[in-house]
């Protein structure tokens, strides 16, 4: 019985992680992030994998990116500024963590 419960719990956790990534992609689409960004390559703004690589050793990256996602920014990735986004602080943190999880 314990083995079955452990297996079900493990399967549930694995599925929860996948659902979370899908949820964050849906959030990025809903907030129009994907209009200027893609996961793999530069569109108007940098690709998310490039952003994750740039900040991989920065312990404060999630907080920094959450601020940029919410308030907008310019100069870090070229001439075109990123406009402020209509996201809550929680959504900005979730999106930042998701972007930084890209490999």
Give names to the regions the model predicted.
Residues 18-19, 58, 62-63, 71:
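Domain-level signature for proteins that mediate thiol-based redox and metal-cofactor handling
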Residues 24, 61, 65, 91-92:
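Stable alpha-helical elements in mature extracytoplasmic
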Residues 35, 44-55, 68-98:
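Axial heme c-ligation environment in periplasmic c-type cytochrome domains
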Residues 22-39:
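Sequence/structural segment immediately N-terminal to covalent heme-attachment motifs in c-type
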Residues 1-23, 103:
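N-terminal export/targeting leaders of redox proteins
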